[in-house]
Amino acid sequence: MNIINLINKKQRGKALNLAEINWFVNAVLNKTIADYQITAFLMAIWFKGMNPNELFLLTKAMVDTGEIIKFNHHGKISVDKHSTGGIGDKVSLALVPILTSLGFSVAKLSGRGLGYTGGTIDKLEAVGVKTELTDQQAQACLDKNDCFIIGQSKDIAPVDKVLYGLRDITGTVDSLPLIASSIMSKKLAVMNEYIFIDLKYGKGAFCKTKKIANELAKLMQSIAKSFKRKLSVKLSDMNQVLGKAVGNVIEVNEAVNFLKQDLDQVGQDFIDLMQTIVINILLETKQAKTKQKAIELYQDVLTSKKAWNRFLSFIESQGGNVELFTQKEGFFKPKYKASIKAEKSGILHFTDPIDLAKIGINLGAGRMKKTDQIDPMAGLFLMKKDNESVAVGDTVLNLYSSSPISNEYISAAQKTIIINK
């Protein structure tokens, strides 16, 4: 068996068998084929696709050649929630303490930000939370608080890291079978009872349309069914920034305000999405028989401050400073700020969430290369959201950084604003 034969077979649109797929995955793992040959194989998949059996075999081989992680959840229902990536997506920061307050166990492995989408790990590290824990330390967090959020182990689905790195530089990122196998290989490697996927679509997501997102959801469902695992995929709109904050500490701040139910500085779209996700989890896991009961359970852990107290316990158990979050003066303290104001009255629209994400990256909130350093205090705050009324002189957008904010970035921010009468 050799890679040329596999490339030619897939180029002709023929299905690969178990032996061929296992050979390919092991060849990638053991570095016995060149990057350009792997790329040619990925390009053949991009053009010809994969049938459900091929997709299952590829995902299984990627899972089996890496570490399988299993934690003791002490009889509680174990859940994992994954977002396909969005701008301003701080859902996991608030969701994990809410779920543990509702009696679930959450062993969550998260990633760093790259490109236009932020990473939960970067946000937690920006406020002093330790995210590199041994399995024993992670289990201790589960024992105490029923949750942890840590960085993904290098030993989970190692072949995916190779394939993703090559897809990223060869124009094959948007292959739906490759996206599905990439996401699912990492999720299936951690033995949780339920997997929930928040699948984003729109201008600020890699699935630009709802149709494409639905196709991807079906592929992931097919994989989960083959593995006999419980998966729920729900679509959510990413045509605008989620919530009001984009950055690291600033996004943690919005999530904290939400958990404290201090909602003046929290986006309504974020509030709505949080409720939708939690209700879905309660219903899918049969912890609530009706939507109304799910809403009641959800609202109780927020109004009683159970979720907020769980958040503080989570922070403490992973080496964070709880006083940072309880001090009156707050913890988001950027050195520099620039306000972008409306130049006329009317209805506000932003050009594209990715335009705002680019400004955030330029300010230091994100990275375009893995080696880029992040400024924890850099970011944006939307004082107004899409379709809101603005008057001349209203502050629409604030920019923050630990370094002086250049006129170039201010000008770029002004260009993202469209006001129609």
Curated annotation (Swiss-Prot):
SMART domains referenced in this protein's UniProt entry, alphabetically: PYNP_C
EC numbers for this chain: 2.4.2.4
Gene3D superfamilies with a match to the protein in the record: Nucleoside phosphorylase/phosphoribosyltransferase catalytic domain, Pyrimidine nucleoside phosphorylase-like, C-terminal domain, Transferase, Pyrimidine Nucleoside Phosphorylase, Chain C
Pfam families attached to this UniProt entry: Glycos_trans_3N, Glycos_transf_3, PYNP_C
Keyword Cytoplasm among record annotations: no
Catalytic activity: thymidine + phosphate = 2-deoxy-alpha-D-ribose 1-phosphate + thymine
GO cellular component terms listed in the entry, alphabetical order: cytosol
Gene Ontology MF terms in the entry: 1,4-alpha-oligoglucan phosphorylase activity; thymidine phosphorylase activity
Gene Ontology terms: biological process: pyrimidine nucleobase metabolic process; pyrimidine nucleoside metabolic process
InterPro entries: Glycosyl_Trfase_fam3 (IPR000312), Glycosyl_Trfase_fam3_N_dom (IPR017459), Glycosyl_Trfase_fam3_N_dom_sf (IPR036320), Nuc_phospho_transferase (IPR035902), PYNP-like_C_sf (IPR036566), PYNP_C (IPR013102), Pyrmidine_PPas_bac/euk (IPR018090), Pyrmidine_PPase_CS (IPR017872)
Segments traversing the membrane: none
Keywords (A to Z) from UniProt: Glycosyltransferase, Transferase
Subunit field text: Homodimer.
Record-linked NCBIfam families: PRK05820.1, Y_phosphoryl
Function: The enzymes which catalyze the reversible phosphorolysis of pyrimidine nucleosides are involved in the degradation of these compounds and in their utilization as carbon and energy sources, or in the rescue of pyrimidine bases for nucleotide synthesis.
Family per record: Belongs to the thymidine/pyrimidine-nucleoside phosphorylase family.
Name of this protein: Thymidine phosphorylase
